[in-house]
Structure formats: structure tokens, C-alpha cells
UniProtKB/Swiss-Prot annotation:
UniProt similarity note: Belongs to the EPSP synthase family.
Function noted in UniProt: Catalyzes the transfer of the enolpyruvyl moiety of phosphoenolpyruvate (PEP) to the 5-hydroxyl of shikimate-3-phosphate (S3P) to produce enolpyruvyl shikimate-3-phosphate and inorganic phosphate.
Keywords: Amino-acid biosynthesis, Aromatic amino acid biosynthesis, Cytoplasm, Transferase
Gene assigned in the entry: aroA
Designated name of the protein: 3-phosphoshikimate 1-carboxyvinyltransferase
Length: 442
């Protein structure tokens, strides 16, 4: 798929089958960093093979961490108390799950580092995290526009003078980065570290993932709801020996959606009713839209209407603050709803791999949908009968745009996906797996 300028989607009628999900991106990159910071060796299984994880693995190797060869999703990492390499230039692509946590860890450890990424990464805000780290005395310099990468880290005097405050309304990754790095400083300073959240914390399920994984590596965080988090002075990461990565719940959303609009059943394995990922809640969104959703240990299955034969999903008006990535799938499903659909509280879309509100608005209109949008909301009215239009869908160098709009193949219009290779960020084989579930229209 890499290098293809476009992919013409076959007109789809039915979808059924089973998909073994690739590992979660959010969990994979968190576990890689935690394993590097922990005492002892950690064998990781089910690791996602993607651009973002390759960026993190390369950075850890560059920082002197002993990282084994990756084979069939398995890799062994020997933890270090502190990164052996104290001077480096790290290129981190467009991987927020690598850039933000590494910024915090490097800033609190000390050394001289330069962190950069692709042009879009340099448009994604990091100022709130930098402001919080400077409260610890970290020396961080913006090498371009203030508030954004690239960064130079070094030259500060790290200290703990009291609680550190971080803004929570832009990205939960800022709090995740501070939480993951804090045990290193707590133990070195001999002081408890408290992080206080300012404003409304978005994407709370991703913080739950962070706290869950920290606990598996031996660090329990005391918390006061969503307002304050305290890491004890004796906190220390310890490798669990072996760590299995769950399947990616955000990726599951596309396949579960196929079952909801293509009759089904479509079953995903690797996530289930016991998942630690918030995006499994997308299955409840599908149920509210009329899909039959079933759960088991390590699996979720959907059945639904056949939209290619005139079936329709129920329209929705919902707050998607807790599942912003899977919400993109819901926006595309609005093409097949029985009325206008409204997605609220999705302001975080503006600072993702692209401005996703603008991108979704633009591409849904190409297909004939009536679309309105604002700072943190999107409303989609399905195309009128006879109103569907053939479209070349721009993916905006955003893997989730490409995967979401694969669902448009169940409509009556011809759909071409531009730059389909952008799915390599999280799921290089997505379109092959997708095609294996479909029955084409005659």
C-alpha cells in the first residue's frame, strides 16, 4: 500500500468475518517507555508494528536503551534508571504518543536534547506541557514558534517546590507525559510529586490507560478525582517480566462499524468487555444507532442493517469527549443515518494529526452530505436520495481519515481514497484486512 497515490474502493454490499486486531498504539508506546524506565527486563508481546512505534523504538535505541530485535510483535527491553545517552537529536515524526512523554522524561532527567518531527508535528501544541515542566525548573527552548515543537531540552535546574499545574483542556497527553515521568524525579528528589489539573480534563479514558499501565510497572498514583495526582517519593518502576499489549480499540471501531452497516456478523478479537481502553465504548454508540452488539472475553461482535440495500442507522446527538478517535468513525456512519447527526465536545480534533473537524467537514461534503461545524462540534446530515456524489477523498496525511472513509464504499457513489499508505501510522495492512470482510455489489 505504501507509495500508492490512490485506492479505488469496490462498491460494498455485505461485511462479515473476524479480525485479529493489531496492538493498541496508545498502550504500545506507553509500555515501551515504561519498560525503558523500569528496573529489570520486560518482554513485550503483541506490540503494534507502525510508524509511531518504530519512532519510539528508534528513539529509545538512540538514547542508549537496550532494545532487542522486534519479531512477530515481540521485543525485550532492558530498563535503565536514566538514559545513558545524554546528548541526542531525536526525530519523532508525527507521533504525539512519543513526542510528549519523551519531552517530559528527558526534561526531568537532564541532558542536552533536540526534538523535532514532521511539519504537522510542529503545528501541534506542546506549550502547556512545557509550562508545567518549567515549574520543575526544566530548561526548554522553542526552536521555532513559541508553544510548538521543535524543542531544545537542557540547561535547567530540576527541583520540586510544590504542586505542578498543567492545563487539561487541550490534550490529555500532557498529563500522561507528566505522570509517566514523575516517578523518576520523585525517587531522585526524595519528595512526593503532585500534579494538579487546570481546566476541564479531556479524553479521561486515556489517563485511565496511563494509570493502569503505571500500576502494572509498580507505581500506584494517589488521586483526587480528576483534579490532582500524587506520586510517592519512593515510587519506582519495576519491569513486570512480560507484558501483553491489547488490540487497538480505536482500530476496532472501523470493523465494528462494518458489521453495523454491512449486516455482519463482524467480530474483532484482542479487545473485549475487560479492555482498559476507553474506545471500547464506541460499541455502545453503535448499539444506540441500532446495531446488535455482543461482548465476550477478548472479543466484540456486531450485526446490523444493510445500508447498501436501503437500511438506515438511527441518528444521534452525543458528547464524544471521552472517545475522540472513535468519534471519527461515528461521523462517517452519519452518512447512513435516518436524520442529521451531531458530534459534540470534539475540540481535541483540532490538534490531532490534522485539524480533523475541518478535514471531516471537507470530505463528507464531497460525498453529498450536508455538514456544519464549529470550534468543537460537527453536524452531518446524510445525503438526500439521489444526492450522493462520486468523490476523491483526501486523507490529510491522517491514518484515521483513510480508515474512516473506507466505510463510504457502502453508499451508491464511487469512492477513491487518496494516499492510502498513510494508514502505516497505525495499521499498514488495513485495506487488505478490510477487503477480506467485504462482499461486493453486483
Amino acid at each position: 500500500m505504501s507509495g500508492l497515490a490512490y485506492l479505488d474502493l469496490p462498491a460494498a454490499r455485505l461485511a462479515r468475518g473476524e479480525v485479529a486486531l493489531p496492538g493498541s498504539k496508545s498502550i504500545s508506546n506507553r509500555v515501551l517507555l515504561l519498560a525503558a524506565l523500569a528496573e529489570g527486563s520486560t518482554e513485550i508481546t503483541g506490540l503494534l508494528d507502525s510508524d509511531d512505534t518504530r519512532v519510539m523504538l528508534a528513539a529509545l535505541r538512540q538514547l542508549g536503551v537496550s532494545v532487542g530485535e522486534v519479531a512477530d510483535g515481540c521485543v525485550t527491553i532492558e530498563g535503565v534508571a536514566r538514559f545513558p545517552t545524554e546528548q541526542a537529536e531525536l526525530f519523532l515524526g508525527n507521533a504525539g504518543t512519543a513526542f510528549r512523554p519523551l519531552t517530559a522524561a528527558l526534561a526531568l532527567m537532564g541532558g542536552d536534547y533536540r526534538l523535532s518531527g514532521v511539519p504537522r508535528m510542529h503545528e501541534r501544541p506542546i506549550g502547556d506541557l512545557v509550562d508545567a515542566l518549567r515549574q520543575f525548573g526544566a530548561g526548554i527552548e522553542y526552536l521555532g514558534q513559541a508553544g510548538y515543537p521543535p524543542l531544545r531540552i537542557g540547561g535547567g535546574s530540576i527541583r520540586v517546590d510544590g504542586p505542578v499545574r498543567v492545563e487539561g483542556s487541550v490534550s490529555s497527553q500532557f498529563l500522561t507525559a507528566l505522570l509517566m515521568a514523575a516517578p523518576v524525579l520523585a525517587r531522585r528528589s526524595g519528595q512526593d510529586i503532585t500534579i494538579e489539573v487546570v481546566g476541564e480534563l479531556i479524553s479521561k479514558p486515556y489517563i485511565e490507560i496511563t494509570l493502569n499501565l503505571m500500576a502494572r510497572f509498580g507505581v500506584s498514583v494517589r488521586r483526587d478525582g480528576w483534579r490532582a495526582f500524587t506520586i510517592a517519593r519512593d515510587a519506582a518502576y519495576r519491569g513486570p517480566g512480560r507484558m501483553a499489549i491489547e488490540g487497538d480499540a480505536s482500530t476496532a471501531s472501523y470493523f465494528l462499524a462494518l458489521g453495523a452497516i454491512g449486516g455482519g456478523p463482524v467480530r474483532v478479537t484482542g479487545v473485549g468487555e475487560d479492555s482498559i481502553q476507553g474506545d471500547v465504548a464506541f460499541a455502545a454508540t453503535l448499539a444506540a444507532m441500532g446495531a446488535d452488539v455482543r461482548y465476550g472475553p477478548g472479543w466484540i461482535e456486531t450485526r446490523g442493517v444493510r445500508v447498501a440495500e436501503g437500511g438506515r442507522l438511527k441518528a444521534f446527538d452525543a458528547d464524544f469527549n471521552l472517545i475522540p478517535d472513535a468519534a471519527m468513525t461515528a461521523a462517517t456512519l452519519a452518512l447512513y443515518a435516518d436524520g442529521p447527526c451531531r458530534l459534540r465536545n470534539i475540540g481535541s480534533w483540532r490538534v490531532k494529526e490534522t485539524d480533523r473537524i475541518h478535514a471531516m467537514h471537507t470530505e463528507l461534503e464531497k460525498l453529498g452530505a450536508g455538514v456544519q461545524s464549529g470550534a468543537d462540534w460537527l453536524e452531518v446530515a446524510p445525503p438526500a436520495p439521489g444526492g450522493w456524489r462520486d468523490a476523491h477523498i483526501g486523507t490529510w496525511d491522517d491514518h484515521r481519515m483513510a480508515m474512516c472513509f473506507s466505510l463510504a464504499a457502502f453508499g451508491p457513489a464511487a469512492v477513491r481514497i487518496l494516499d492510502p499508505g498513510c494508514v502505516s501510522k497505525t495499521f499498514p495492512d488495513y485495506f487488505d484486512v478490510y477487503a477480506g470482510l467485504l462482499a461486493a455489489r453486483d
